[in-house]
Amino acid sequence: MANSGILRLGNYLLIDRLGEGGMAEVFLAQYSGGEHSVGPQSQVVVKRIKPSLYKSTEFPVFREMFLNEAKLVRSLQHPNLARMYALLEAVDDDLGVKVPFIVGEYIRGVQLWELMRLGTQGFTGKGVPPAIAAFIAREMARGLGHAHAHKDPATGKAQPIIHRDISPENIMVSQDGLVKVIDFGVAKALGGFGPQTRTGIIKGKLAYMAPEQVTQKVVPATDVFGAGIVLHELLTGRRLFGGSNEYLVVSRVLKAEIPRPSSLNPGVPKELDDVTMKALSRDLRGRFADGNAMADALTAVLESVPALSGTTHHTIRDWVRKLTSEAKQVAQGWEEQESGLHVDVQNALAHSVAKGEDVV
């Protein structure tokens, strides 16, 4: 989509496809006039159901899931959650089908998985600085904690929203060092509205799911386990529950020994070790009850451990800029090497031709 021209959806020009999942696709979009813009930014994110599903017999299910996400997310306002501006409808010009779409905040930044890839040297066992890991995990937990503390607007009763898909792909770090949880596409409100998960379908990425997700019994602590996996991988630079197939991954989630981060990275303080392992308790009774509890524990560690104290958004910002700058330099170096090789080959060919040598 990025190089195939610009499409329109309602009053928004879809400029570039930013990503896609099994059900939906996300675009960088520009407000193009007409009715008043629904967001403070001229550039926004537009999320819609993939057009290939419009004619599917499952489209009503996908539509219900999509509308459920919008209902959940629009009630959440927090600095560590990507903001949703509006749920709108428009006719798809190509197919003539009326479809819903979400307009949300465009975060100028990088997905955490990319920062982890750069910061851990491709998951080769080098963890990111513990202070960076702890701060990112604390901000992530704060965003989740806000969702977990959600109340039904009509009754005021507790109605926790469970993300169910916490992974490095669904965490953004902005250019300013702000950490934001994105994509509540498979979220569930306990005791609230929304489609029920059909029997046999597990929501979320297998390598980041909690053991109880196998039996579809999700609670706020379910998200904590996913956050714990992310924190563990940040600290160690290794996949925690990798595997060559889905069965092996699920088996490891359920039974594999979980090493303390410090056993793989001696630079991890004991206090941060303890928080990580508590988040990864397979027994719900031993795990943080929700995101806020995990965030509070990480705040205490960040404030009490000298090696971690003083970490701020500016620290994260500088780290992100350093990583991305180094990545650009490496890429530029490869391009220069390839360009130099191309020139060398051309010179060699020219020299051979001048001497009358065969070059084929």
Predicted regions: what they are:
Residues 1-259:
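Conserved ATP-binding/catalytic core of the eukaryotic-like protein kinase fold
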Residues 207-347:
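C-terminal lobe helix-coil module of Hanks-type protein kinase domains
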